[in-house]
Structures are given as structure tokens and as C-alpha cells.
């Protein structure tokens, strides 16, 4: 299972700076979907061969009252469920009462914790960090997150216990690796492997949108409520099922619930459990509450699913019992705020009464089939050439970018690898045009599609051009001319 790293600390110690550095993406087409919220608190990270989820907990001010407030509840839950906690402090400001309070809480939880003294640039780091040893949480790691100093070493050290599970052999400093990109043969093997496995479906959404009700409706039985007991909060529940001859595994992120009153069951929402479920799924079913419309939390979950490359279906729940005026307003909001994912099917359902639930699986199968359908190299190359014929690549330094051929580089999500000359200099607008061209040509529905560009080898790169004898003579004459003029 992919490890989760939680960033903990009082405000203004650099959590967001480190979060942004860790979750940066090299391909704007993966993360830069217009319309997505920019204020993300969780994301996927790839660094030095490690893949992990990073969570900016926020919401903890270090005071005893603050830790017990509703605002801090989600942050504390994230700390509980994280595999590694990075406790960030400000080396310039020194040790504060808030730091001591947070450290006391972390010690009581016995989490794998690393103390990070941030903002060490321009100061005597050893002297500034000495007092943080008194927190009693072990070694203090120095970092300047804004400049990137110490970030890679910190992550490597913190995630070393997970290296074997990820198949990573540590051999000193490494650059970031490109995720999930295969050769043509490896991509074909991956596609065959996916075809033999059941479809993993993660049902996600913010609290109380009807995830549990929909899960029960799909399974056709009333699930037993699972109470909070030690050891039950870490993982989602995996439920195998068969429908119309096809095997599924439902990943139930709402499986753990707590009873607050005798007759009332309140769903316990866990961000980390949801993120892990998305990582492990083939298809994500995002539930939106029709009565509340598209919330920022919906967009955050949607963004994570897209960045993970998962096939996607959206269900607008509680559609029954609302008047036509509200329905029209909700549809208008969906068009406005979710227009950037026009490839995903949207269904209007009632999980409670079962209205529209049956049609969900048609879209789930369609999305999965699109995400895992094999496409030949000849077909992909032909589509690439057609896109060039319709709209030529721009000139770069007076030369036309030349695209040579394309092949499959992975599935779920579908990855198309395009080889050519100067492809690294293609503007994002042309890359986005090509991505949409491939989507239309392949009739891809319900899944994001990713393009990777690989530069062709240039045999003349880094070679000094050797002059002919006549060119050498002209060069000498020109140089002597210049010297005479200076005299």
C-alpha cells in the first residue's frame, strides 16, 4: 500500500511550501485542469523513486483548546492514519509553546515522527536547531523547503522502511523517476494483467452524501454497522461481488462509522482512507449531494482522482424530492464547474430508492474498458499524423517540431508516448490539442488520457562541428581583420 506522509506544525512554519514542492508535477496536462481548486490539502508525490501521498494537515494551532476544536478534528484523524509524520518547526523563530504542545500530542500517539527544522537558509543552522532536541522526538532534520535543501534526503530517510515494498534499491542520490510509463511490450503485458482482474470500484465523496446507502443498494443487502474499535479505522473494506457475469471489488470508504446517539449513525469521514482507496481502484465513483451542489471538497477529491489517472463516473445523489427549479440550477452548476471533465458520465440517482443506480454500472464498465483497451502502435501513429495534418506543430527557433511515431505507454490511465525531435519545446496548448485529438479519435470515455513526449536521439548533439580547410582559412582572415581594426 502506498505510504502516507502527514505534514504537521503550527501556522507559517512552511508546511504549504514543502507540500507544493513535493506535489509539483512535471506535466501540466496531468494536474492543470482549469476549474480545479488550487487550495489542495493532499496530493500524490514522486521523489527519488518513492511514490507516496502527502497530506498538509493544517488546523492545529498548538494550544490545548485548539487541539480539541472541531477545526482540528480532521487534522488529528490524518495524524492517526498517516504512516509517517513530519513535525515541522521554524528554525528562525525558535522553539515555541505551540511546538511543545503539538510535540506532547505526537509523543502520546507514538507515531513514526521526524522533527524538521525549516527555514535554515542564511542562519547558523546547528545553533538554531539545538533547542528542538528538547522535544524528545529524536533527531532534528535541517531543511530549507523554499530552496529545496534537505528535502530529498529527508524523504529518503523517512521512507526507507518502505523501499523494499516499492522495489527501490537505494544507490545514493537519484533523480525523480517518471511514473507508470512502460515500453510497448510492458504496456501490452500490463493490459493483459488488468483484463484478468476484477474491476476495483472506489465509492468516494464528502461526509453524508449517501456512500453507505449506495453501497447497500448495490450489494442488495443491509450492511452491518461497523463500530469504532482499535485497528478498524486504518483500512477501507473490500467487498467482492458479481454483476452480469463480471467480477467487481467494491472499496467501501464509509465502512467505519460511529454511533453518536441511540438512533443516529454518523459517518466518520477519513481523507486518508479515501485517498488510499483511490490509489488502489481502477474506477472511482464520486458521489455529489444534489441539495448542496458542487462543494470545494468535491473538487479536491475529483482533482486527486484525476491526478491518479483513475477512470471516473459521477453520481449526483438525492435527486428525488427536489423541485424542478433546483434541478435546473444544479445542472447549470455542474456544467459550469465540471465542464473540464466532459469525458466523465454524470448520473442523477437516488441511492435510497434505487432510481438510476442500475445505469451506473453501464458507465463504470464503459470507463474501465476505455481505460484498459489496447491500441496498436500503427493506430496511435496514424492518429498522431492526422493531428499534425489538421494542425501543424509550431516552429521552434525557426525549425518545425517533428513528431515521428507513437505507442502505448500504459493503461488505467491510457498513456500515449510520442517520440520526435524538439518535442520538449512543444507549448502546452499544442499538447492539449493533441490530447483532445487522441481522445476524440479513440472515443475514450470516462477516463483521463495522458501524453508523454520523448526526445529523439540527436547524433550531432554535444559535438563540435569540424571546419573544412577553406572555412578555416576564411575564419583566420576574419580574425586578423578584426585585430587590424582594433589597432
UniProtKB/Swiss-Prot annotation:
One of its GO terms (biological process) is ribosome biogenesis. Residues 3-166, 199-372 form the EngA-type G domain. It comes from the Bacteria. Residues 373-457 form the KH-like domain. One of its GO terms (molecular function) is ribosome binding. The keyword Hydrolase does not apply. InterPro entries: G_ENGA, GTP-bd, GTPase_Der, KH_dom-like, KH_dom-like_a/b, P-loop_NTPase, Small_GTP-bd. GTP 1 binds at residues 9-16, 56-60, 118-121. CDD domains: EngA1, EngA2. Keywords: GTP-binding, Nucleotide-binding, Repeat, Ribosome biogenesis. PROSITE patterns: G_ENGA. GTP 2 binds at residues 205-212, 252-256, 317-320. Belongs to the TRAFAC class TrmE-Era-EngA-EngB-Septin-like GTPase superfamily. EngA (Der) GTPase family. GTPase that plays an essential role in the late steps of ribosome biogenesis. Associates with the 50S ribosomal subunit. NCBIfam families: GTPase_EngA, small_GTP. This is GTPase Der. It comes from Shewanella oneidensis (strain ATCC 700550 / JCM 31522 / CIP 106686 / LMG 19005 / NCIMB 14063 / MR-1).
